[in-house]
Amino acid sequence: MPSFKTLDDLSDIRGKRVLVRVDLNVPVKDGKVTDTTRIERVAPTILELSEKGAKVILLAHFGRPKDGPSPELSLSLIAPSVEEVLDHAVSTASDCIGEAAASAVAAMNDGDILLLENTRFHKGEEKNDPDFTKALAANGDIYVNDAFSAAHRAHASTEGLAHHLPAYAGRTMQAELEALEKGLGDPARPVVAIVGGAKVSTKIDLLMNLVKKVDALVIGGGMANTFIAARGTNVGKSLCEHDLAETARQIMIEAATSGCAIILPEDGVIAREFKAGAANETVDIDAIPADAMVLDVGPKSVQAISAWIERASTLVWNGPLGAFEIEPFDAATVGAAKYAAERTTAGKLTSVAGGGDTVSALNHAGVADDFTYVSTAGGAFLEWMEGKELPGVAVLNAAR
């Protein structure tokens, strides 16, 4: 089990300057925040520290600035939404280091919340530059990392600061790490993984790691076609990476060696065009017409997947089973997700899901709140599933 300090380990922090790394990389349209999910996720940590009398100093990046500061990527655009979610005044500073930051921090009272400017306005952030890290650390007494979604990056505000200040995991980071530990670290068995999405090429490391750790691996989405084709079955005009047939075979061999069952679709929903309401039919997977494409797994496959979910004590899910954005090719994803949610709410399954499309798919199915844990961290969640060490997490464990 990862061992890290949490807010429970912080005693008297009244008047202490607490630097909190948060993820405020939210979508903005016409100057307005369109989705406050990430702000809502970090609110408990911020408010807990504020209520305990700390001076709460928020560090975050926003977008990918190319050459220093740019007004459209200023965190001052996000501040009103942060205030709204927290229902608490939030002041801002025009920089995250130097005189502007120092004077804003000096003006704080106990319990105040200050949002410093975009850390990526300085090249030292992404380079994890020691001088830049020291300049950030100068404004704090304690460091709290609550940005799991940026933990796969060894940047100054996500990794470097933990070498300069006492380091703790915030509540979101803590919840994420505890959920992930239940998912793959030390899970209740049997463990079933569902991996979908379009391409095998983006998930080779993930699949290779999972077959060594789970009892069954369900492969869906466009990537299933690559595995089906690798077995010598014609997949018609379906999305398929034929050049990765050998990679798919290697993954299947590794699975057999590790005692992991690979579950591929038995049937598929096919169409001749990729559009909502397109004429479609369900065929066995070895009867795909040459002029058709598979856009979802079929009902027999969903039954088989549900049977594996029923057997499982733990489910890890990344990626949709079909082209869920377009009806009726959302049926398999919705069906399997609803069954997993049902088992979870009945207390019979620990279900952990993550990755951008996965969150959208579970929201589409209306069951995201019924899973044990749904991670909003894209890249960090995938790298964790690939078995890679995350710098932002490793440094918290070291700080223990």
UniProtKB/Swiss-Prot annotation:
Entry-linked PROSITE patterns: PGLYCERATE_KINASE (PS00111)
Key words, A-Z: ATP-binding, Cytoplasm, Glycolysis, Kinase, Nucleotide-binding, Transferase
Single GO molecular function: ATP binding
EC class (word): transferase
PANTHER family membership: PHOSPHOGLYCERATE KINASE, PHOSPHOGLYCERATE KINASE 1, CHLOROPLASTIC-RELATED
Biological or metabolic pathway of the protein: Carbohydrate degradation; glycolysis; pyruvate from D-glyceraldehyde 3-phosphate: step 2/5
InterPro entries registered for this protein in UniProt: Phosphoglycerate_kinase (IPR001576), Phosphoglycerate_kinase_CS (IPR015911), Phosphoglycerate_kinase_N (IPR015824), Phosphoglycerate_kinase_sf (IPR036043)
The EC number(s) this enzyme carries: 2.7.2.3
Reactions catalysed: (2R)-3-phosphoglycerate + ATP = (2R)-3-phospho-glyceroyl phosphate + ADP
Binding residues for ATP: K203, E325, G355, G356, D357, T358
Binding site residues for substrate: D23, L24, N25, R38, H61, F62, G63, R64, R120, R153
Subcellular location: Cytoplasm
Family: Belongs to the phosphoglycerate kinase family.
GO biological process, alphabetically ordered: gluconeogenesis; glycolytic process
A Pfam entry, by short name: PGK
Annotated disulfide bonds: none
Name by which UniProt lists this protein: Phosphoglycerate kinase
Coiled-coil residues: none
